Amino acid sequence: MSTPARSRSLLIVIAFAVVYIGWGTTYLANHFLLRELPPFVLGALRFFLAGGLALAWTLSQPRAPIQRSDWGSALAGGILLIAVGQGALIYANQYLPTGILAMLYTTLPLWSVALEWLLGERPPTWVLIGLLIASGGIVLLMSNSLGDEASTAQWFAGSLVVLATLLWACGAWLLRQRPPFSSSWRGLSMQMLIGASLLALFGLWHGDWQHLPTANLSREAWLWLLYLVLPVSLGVYPAYFWLLREVPASLVSTFAFVNPVVALLLGYLLLNEQLSLTALGACLATLLGVSLIIFGRR
C-alpha cells in the first residue's frame, strides 16, 4: 500500500472512531440536559451555538464565493440530518430509555443499504450477512432491555425515530450525490444554522420557548451543552460529512449499530448499571456484524 493510500486509510479509521464514540455519547448528554431544557430549545441552542462558531471560523479565513449548489446541499443536510434526524432523537429521548432509543437508530444502516439497492447498487454478500448479524445483536440487546408494554407516547416517539432514520438515509444519499461545498466549514455552518432555525420553529409550535430556564441552568447542564457544541457538533459532524465523500453511505451509517454498544458501556462504567451476559453477547454480535459490513466491501 502506497503512503498516500495508507494515510487515507488511517484518516478513515480515525474519522470512524470519532463518529462512533462521539455520537455514542450524545444520548447520555441529551438525557441529562432534558432534565433542565425542553427538547427543541436544547436542539436549537446546540446547533445555533455550533453553527455560529463554525461561521465565525469561516469568516476569519480566506473565502471562496458561495456556489448555488451549496444552498441545495445545506438545505438537504440542515433539514433531513439535523432538524429531522437530531430533532426526533432529542424529542424521543423524553419518552424512551437511552439504550432503546439508540437501538431504534440502528434502522439507519438498513435504510441506507435498501436505498443503495433500490438505486441499482447491490451490496456484497458479506455486507448483507453483517447486517443480519448486527441486526440480530440489536434485537438481542433490545429483548434484554424490554419492560412493560410501551405507552402511546413511547410508540409515537419510536415511530418518529424510525421515520427520521429513513429521512436521514435519504439526506445522506443526497449529500453524497451533490457537489462538495465550496468551503467545508461554511457548509457545516449553513447546515447547522438551517437546522437550528427549524428546531426553533418546532419549539415555538410545541410551546418549548414558554419554558426557558437558561438563567437557572446548573453548572452540569452548561458543561453537557458545551460538550455537545464543541467535541460532538464541531468534531463529529465534519468527520461524518467527510466520510460521506470517501466511503459508501451504508458504511458510514454503521455508527448507528455501534451507538447502543457505546451507550450500554457508558451506563456500566459511569452509572453503575448492570451488564448481563446476554447484553455482553449482544454487543459482541453487533460488533462482529459491523466488522463484516466494513471489511465485506474490500
Across the structure, where does each feature detected by a protein language model lie?
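Transmembrane alpha-helices of multi-pass small-molecule transport proteins
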Residues: 11, 34-84, 109-115, 133, ...
